[in-house]
């Protein structure tokens, strides 16, 4: 084992009265900042650029500087240092001047996950974990509980489309959040209910091997409070195996999935059964049993995986006392999460009439397969068009480790455009680029390493009524609207990666 899980213990204690957050505009950090501000904590922070998140936090009372500088530690006033500095574990290098200054001044440094644990410690924590689907399932859970009148606090890894926010301090006693496994930080939490959607090797740059990655979820299950529940998807073999081990250890387990999958695991107590799932109007009609109650609702989102995520939300909500009928109505009104099969536009006239453009955060082969499967449903339902994947690999290590799997997943599309790797926190690796995947694919593919040329490459291969997806966790999201403009004939503006 390359990671010592004993180094990750549940975090409890008092919230600091003031914090300085480095990288405050990030998806996870900005959500924590919103809740801290709502609780009356003094918040300062810094980020590399202005953003909607930064503007919104300033409006709530945060003092935020653009650019990183040691003097930012005194944004609250000259000589007034924060009680703690908060960082997102993977994103902030040790050479950051504010982080280095905090160490020199003996200011405690907390990870984002530490602060989230402190925020949740007096609530019923309903946490969503798993390799894929965390943000969608967390957002669905929030929507379901809100419809049931519980007003939960929540912290989500993306912006909920309807609410336009990623976090909220609620009046209820339930706190819904994602439990991120990428750096084992989920082990700092003590959930009342833990949902695990699936388990598949990822983040091997941190864990080192598959077995250590699997083991972090077993350790997470051990963090569940006495009398709490572990909710797992029986359709995922590793999640189901974890559920079976948890049953043997005396943990309360509830499984969800289709009838066939549940029948393969007879020792797993059943929380929900998916009886029917029918694509309709770009979404799906769902028929299921949750506990002993039959429910029917329609989702706005395509893909069977989204129906399973909805069941996870209902089982988790049932564990904290939410009304099933009201949750089902809430799921029917759920409009999605930005960057999760996020609709950007369609072409109304011209040579590409009827083409639809979506954007998705998928950055693992299984996620790519799921999103392309959902896109296939749309063209099948329409009876015309093809699926075009515009994919930007994320991280050099992940591209190297999963090149074959990415090639197979992307080959579920009809055509593809491959960008170069979005390295994020990593340095380039020799021989690792978008072509590494493109050369292994079995469908027509264009490798385009020049970011601003991608919309033109899409135009060369697009046809009427195609479903076109920009896919990846990096800057590829900026191209969705550019492709809409390119295919509409309004391509005067360009973006830079």
What spans do the regions from the language model cover?
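Acidic-glycine-rich active-site phosphate/pyrophosphate-binding loop
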Residues: 275-295
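ATP-dependent carboxylate-amine ligase
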Residues: 1-65, 81-83, 139, 218, ...
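Glycine/charged-rich beta-loop-alpha catalytic/anionic-binding loops adjacent to active sites
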Residues: 122-124, 290-299, 346-357
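Phosphate-binding loop of NTP-binding sites
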Residues: 10, 35-38, 58, 73-77, ...
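Conserved SAM/SAH-binding loop
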Residues: 67-71, 115, 451
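N-terminal Rossmann-like NAD(P) cofactor-binding module of classical short-chain dehydrogenase/reductase
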Residues: 86, 195, 469
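BRCT (BRCA1 C-terminal) domain core and associated BRCT-interaction motifs
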Residues: 68-84
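Conserved RecA-like helicase motor-core motifs
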Residues: 44-46, 149-156, 254-258, 446
């Amino acid at each position: 084992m390359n990671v010592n899980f004993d180094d990750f213990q549940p975090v409890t204690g008092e919230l600091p009265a003031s914090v300085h957050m480095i990288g405050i505009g990030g998806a996870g950090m900005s959500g924590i900042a919103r809740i801290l501000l709502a609780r009356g904590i003094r918040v300062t922070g810094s980020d590399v650029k202005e953003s909607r998140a930064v503007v919104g936090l300033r409006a709530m009372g945060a003092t935020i500087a653009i650019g990183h500088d040691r003097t930012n530690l005194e944004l609250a006033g000259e000589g007034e240092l924060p009680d703690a500095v908060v960082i997102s574990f993977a994103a902030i290098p040790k050479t950051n001047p504010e982080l280095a200054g905090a160490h020199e001044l003996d200011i405690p440094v907390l990870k984002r996950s530490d602060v989230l644990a402190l925020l949740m410690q007096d609530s019923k924590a309903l946490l969503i974990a798993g390799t894929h689907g965390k943000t969608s399932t967390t957002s669905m859970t929030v929507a379901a509980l809100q419809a049931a009148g519980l007003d939960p606090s929540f912290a989500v890894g993306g912006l909920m489309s309807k609410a336009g926010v990623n976090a909220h301090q609620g009046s209820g006693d339930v706190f819904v959040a994602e439990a991120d496994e990428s750096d084992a930080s989920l082990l700092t939490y003590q959930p009342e209910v833990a949902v695990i959607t699936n388990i598949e090797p990822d983040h091997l740059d941190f864990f080192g091997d598959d077995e250590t990655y699997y083991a972090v979820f077993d350790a997470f299950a051990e963090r569940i409070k006495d009398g709490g529940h572990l909710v797992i998807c029986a359709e995922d073999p590793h999640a189901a195996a974890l559920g079976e081990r948890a049953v043997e250890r005396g943990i309360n387990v509830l499984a969800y999935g289709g009838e066939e999958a549940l029948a393969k695991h007879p020792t797993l107590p059943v929380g929900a059964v998916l009886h029917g799932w029918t694509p309709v109007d770009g979404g799906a009609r769902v028929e299921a049993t949750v506990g002993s109650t039959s429910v029917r609702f329609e989702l706005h989102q395509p893909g069977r995986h989204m129906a399973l995520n909805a069941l996870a939300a209902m089982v988790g909500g049932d564990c904290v006392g939410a009304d099933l009928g009201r949750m089902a109505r809430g799921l029917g009104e759920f409009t999605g999460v930005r960057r999760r099969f996020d609709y950007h536009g369609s072409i109304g006239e011209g040579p590409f009439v009827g083409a639809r453009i979506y954007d998705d955060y998928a950055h693992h082969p299984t996620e790519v397969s799921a999103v392309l499967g959902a896109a296939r449903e749309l063209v099948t339902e329409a009876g015309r068009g093809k699926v075009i994947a515009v994919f930007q690999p994320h991280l050099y290590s992940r591209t190297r480790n999963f090149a074959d799997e990415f090639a197979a997943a992307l080959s579920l599309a009809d055509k593809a455009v491959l960008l170069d790797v979005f390295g994020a926190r990593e340095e380039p690796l020799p021989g690792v680029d978008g072509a590494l995947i493109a050369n292994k694919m079995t469908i027509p593919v264009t490798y385009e390493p020049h970011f601003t040329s991608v919309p033109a490459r899409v135009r060369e291969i697009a046809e009427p009524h195609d479903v076109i997806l920009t896919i990846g966790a990096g800057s590829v999201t900026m191209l969705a609207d550019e492709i809409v403009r390119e295919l509409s004939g309004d391509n005067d503006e360009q973006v830079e990666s």
